[in-house]
Amino acid sequence: MLPNQILTDITTVKHSFKAETFRPISTLSLSRNLSVSKFVPCLSKENKRDVLETIAKEFSNIEGEEFFVLPLKDLPIWQRECLLEHYLCPYDLSGSLEGEALIVNRAGTLLAGINLRDHLVLHGIDFVWQPEMLLQKLIDLDIRLQQSLSFAFSPDFGFLTTDPLRCGTALVARAFIHVPALRYRNKLSELLVPHQREFACSSLLPLSQESLGDILCLSNICSLGVSEEQILSSLRLVVSKILSAETEARNLLLKENSTEIKNRILRSIGMLTHSCYLDLQEALDATSWIQLGMSMQWIEDSEKHPLWSPMFWDLRRGHLALYNQDPANKTIEKEIIAQIRAQTTKPQAERLILRV
């Protein structure tokens, strides 16, 4: 179990970034497998424990960076969820958990998954849309680990992974973009059609098809036969296109001065101000409308605090448990979390000033 203070330090690092409204968030993942072991689906529990011990030992030897090894079987559910939320990791940790672990750095930007889909996944998050710098950090860590570990590699297929499409560079690059105006105007699908063979689209929650808070997640479909630089360059081009279209859509909404939009924004403020219970969908959708209103200068925060960026994470149940519950009595029980979520949004909504 990770001490609460360390977990709090890790999860609050994102609050220090005063990101612009449109700035995307990116995550990068490099998958690796030990050359001396079978792929994860073929491993026994004992073999998985051996892989975990081998890899974890190397992280403890890395100088200049403090890492925490967290076996999943010993990690409370709420801490697992909190870490996955913070790093925007698309993994389901409800399996056997034996021989599986997360390894996180003190800075709150790097995470390694052991025996999840592959023996090792090096994962990082970038809050200021500088994925090239994040990639270099992951590559440096990968090179350091390869000094002691031999990863499965083929001259023809690159790094070998459980999923054949993820061979090659074995890089998955994701961009999370807030696109409320495009969704409202039903313009998003036509923008994405030319890129559907190269990038997959999903929501904030990888196992859900529901759009949460008007967040679009783009990720490359294949890493075989393309370099890391090519993947990031293509992702930047698509994201830039979407951001330009979102800006244009917001300007049109502002010009139209739509009563319907204003009504949705005002109803969202009312919901966050007066609700006793809020599920995640309701809370993020309402927050998205409010953030849209703030970007159009129809709403102002009396304390000049950013709203969307912290709330993007802080309304999810792992973060709610961390920040709002007694250390000895943490729970992610649905009704309790819904009540805490409503209590969290109320003071945020009450300090908003209407300019419409």
Curated annotation (Swiss-Prot):
Enzymatic reactions: L-arginyl-[protein] + ATP = N(omega)-phospho-L-arginyl-[protein] + ADP + H(+)
PROSITE patterns (UniProt xref): PHOSPHAGEN_KINASE_C
Binding site for ATP: 25-29, 172-176, 202-207
Cystine bridges: none
GO molecular function: ATP binding; phosphotransferase activity, nitrogenous group as acceptor; protein kinase activity
Stored Pfam families: ATP-gua_Ptrans (PF00217)
Keyword terms of this UniProt record: ATP-binding, Kinase, Nucleotide-binding, Transferase
Enzyme Commission number: 2.7.14.1
Domain of life: Bacteria
Residues annotated as domain Phosphagen kinase C-terminal: 22-249
HAMAP family on file: Prot_Arg_kinase
Family in the record: Belongs to the ATP:guanido phosphotransferase family.
Function: Catalyzes the specific phosphorylation of arginine residues in proteins.
Protein name as annotated: Protein-arginine kinase
Organism expressing this protein natively: Chlamydia muridarum (strain MoPn / Nigg)
